[in-house]
From Swiss-Prot:
Originating species: Mus musculus (Mouse)
Binding-site residues for phylloquinone, renumbered to this chain: C135, Y139
Catalysed reaction, written as an equation: phylloquinone + [protein]-disulfide + H2O = 2,3-epoxyphylloquinone + [protein]-dithiol; phylloquinol + [protein]-disulfide = phylloquinone + [protein]-dithiol
Activity control summary: Inhibited by warfarin (coumadin). Warfarin locks VKORC1 in both redox states into the closed conformation.
Domain notes: Partially oxidized VKORC1 forms a cysteine adduct with substrates, vitamin K 2,3-epoxide, inducing a closed conformation, juxtaposing all cysteines (S-S or SH) for unimpeded electron transfer. VKOR becomes fully oxidized with an open conformation that releases reaction products, vitamin K quinone, or hydroquinone. Cys-132 and Cys-135 constitute the catalytic redox-active center. Cys-43 and Cys-51 are the cysteine pair that mediates transfer of reducing equivalents during catalysis.
The keyword Endoplasmic reticulum is annotated on this UniProt entry: yes
Protein family according to the UniProt entry: Belongs to the VKOR family.
PANTHER family (alphabetical): VITAMIN K EPOXIDE REDUCTASE COMPLEX SUBUNIT 1, VITAMIN K EPOXIDE REDUCTASE COMPLEX, SUBUNIT 1
Protein name: Vitamin K epoxide reductase complex subunit 1
Residue numbers on the Lumenal membrane side: 30-80, 129-131
Tissues and organs where the protein is expressed, per its UniProt entry: Detected in liver.
Localization per record: Endoplasmic reticulum membrane
Cytoplasmic side: 1-9, 96-100, 154-161
E.C. designation(s): 1.17.4.4
Length: 161
């Protein structure tokens, strides 16, 4: 049976749009901070609660790994927010497809995002000693998308005459 289009569901749609909005906001904060070091984002509540400090850290690009593995000029050494935008768009598109491969990719991509979230949360708390509201919210969104990806999609029942 081939792949067909369907609604991604309201919960997946809401989570993907929220994740996309937060990723775009993180890009905005990082760009504003690059232009003005004194920029204070809405998510900068105090010295230990500062998303702009986290986004501007070395772990805010390529998960802090790409530069050391592939070099600073690698095309993959992008802001983590770029990867977030791509991930949430992919999740939304895959959520609209009904098919075996779409389901497999949905599960695999959500598992990778949760693994990345655990890694970045560890960096956030134990290396940067910070609390990033935007980051924590995206981690929760990633867990929600992972849980959704494991739910069985109801099949359309054909009417018997």
């Amino acid at each position: 049976m081939g792949t067909t289009w369907r609604s991604p569901g309201l919960v997946r749609l809401a989570l993907c749009l929220a994740g996309l909005a937060l990723s775009l906001y993180a890009l905005h904060v990082k760009a504003a901070r690059a232009r003005d070091e004194n920029y204070r984002a809405l998510c900068d509540v105090g010295t230990a609660i500062s998303c702009s400090r986290v986004f501007s850290s070395r772990w805010g690009r390529g998960f802090g790994l790409v530069e050391h593995m592939l070099g600073a000029d690698s095309v993959l050494n992008q802001s983590n927010s770029i990867f977030g935008c791509l991930f949430y768009t992919l999740q939304l598109l895959l959520g609209c497809l009904r098919g075996r491969w779409a389901s497999i990719l949905l599960v695999l991509s959500s598992l990778v995002s949760v693994a990345g979230s655990v890694y970045l949360a560890w960096i956030l708390f134990f290396v940067l000693y910070d609390f990033c509201i935007v980051c924590i919210t995206t981690y929760a969104i990633n867990v929600g998308l992972m849980l959704l990806s494991f739910q069985k999609v109801p099949e359309h029942k054909t009417k018997k005459h």
